[in-house]
């Protein structure tokens, strides 16, 4: 069954906008998956160590027949192809791809939590998501406009021409 999936994209190394575009191009090649929409891009302050570049962020909507862990594996393979190194939590990275929502599913697996944990506190996730689905209700019952109202538009700005 086709599921609508929202994936967060982020990069702060090696030409971040190009990294995100390369990831979107890779989404087009995923089996049983179609890229439906992409939010405007934003620039945001890093969550982790302050001595790193600001991030470029966005959200993509995909329709997929892949199982959640199969999609996660495919996204992590894209990260690796683009030079992702997992050494410092919340450190700089060429590409970060996170499954935010997977249809109406609630998942609490060792490798995957859906809705994505802490998304409600991350402006760089909520605002691009709202660009794609402004009235979205999450599978756990939370309503995106309420999450936005509780998450100030701080440390983030929409990129011109994005």
Curated annotation (Swiss-Prot):
Its domain of life reads Bacteria
Residues in the signal sequence? none
Q: Name one GO biological process term.
A: tetrahydrofolate biosynthetic process
**Per the record's keyword annotation, is Cytoplasm included, yes or no?**
no
Molecular function as annotated in GO:
2-amino-4-hydroxy-6-hydroxymethyldihydropteridine diphosphokinase activity; ATP binding; kinase activity
Q: What EC number(s) are associated with this protein in UniProt? A: 2.7.6.3
Pathway this chain belongs to:
Cofactor biosynthesis; tetrahydrofolate biosynthesis; 2-amino-4-hydroxy-6-hydroxymethyl-7,8-dihydropteridine diphosphate from 7,8-dihydroneopterin triphosphate: step 4/4
Task: Name the InterPro entries on file.
Answer: Hppk, Hppk_sf
Q: Which SUPFAM superfamilies match?
A: 6-hydroxymethyl-7,8-dihydropterin pyrophosphokinase, HPPK
Q: Which reaction(s) does the protein catalyse, per the Swiss-Prot or TrEMBL entry?
A: 6-hydroxymethyl-7,8-dihydropterin + ATP = (7,8-dihydropterin-6-yl)methyl diphosphate + AMP + H(+)
Its keywords, alphabetically, are: ATP-binding, Folate biosynthesis, Kinase, Nucleotide-binding, Transferase
Q: What is the annotated role of this protein in its UniProt record?
A: Catalyzes the transfer of pyrophosphate from adenosine triphosphate (ATP) to 6-hydroxymethyl-7,8-dihydropterin, an enzymatic step in folate biosynthesis pathway.
Question: Which family, according to the similarity comment?
Answer: Belongs to the HPPK family.
Which protein are we looking at? Answer: 2-amino-4-hydroxy-6-hydroxymethyldihydropteridine pyrophosphokinase
Name of the gene this protein is made from: folK
């Amino acid at each position: 069954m086709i599921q609508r999936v929202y994936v967060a994209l982020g990069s702060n190394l090696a030409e971040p906008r190009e990294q995100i575009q390369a990831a979107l191009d890779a989404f087009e090649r995923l089996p049983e998956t179609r890229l439906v929409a992409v939010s405007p891009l934003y620039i945001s302050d890093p969550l982790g160590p302050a001595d790193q570049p600001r991030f470029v962020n966005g959200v993509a909507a995909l329709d997929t027949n892949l199982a959640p862990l199969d999609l996660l594996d495919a996204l992590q393979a894209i990260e690796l192809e683009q030079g992702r190194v997992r050494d410092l939590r919340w450190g700089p990275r060429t590409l970060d791809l996170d499954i935010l929502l997977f249809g109406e599913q609630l998942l609490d697996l060792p490798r995957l939590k859906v809705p994505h944990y802490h998304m409600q506190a991350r402006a760089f996730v909520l605002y691009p998501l709202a660009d794609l689905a402004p009235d979205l209700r999450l599978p756990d019952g939370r309503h995106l406009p309420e999450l936005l109202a509780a998450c100030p538009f701080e440390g983030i700005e929409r990129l011109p021409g994005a």
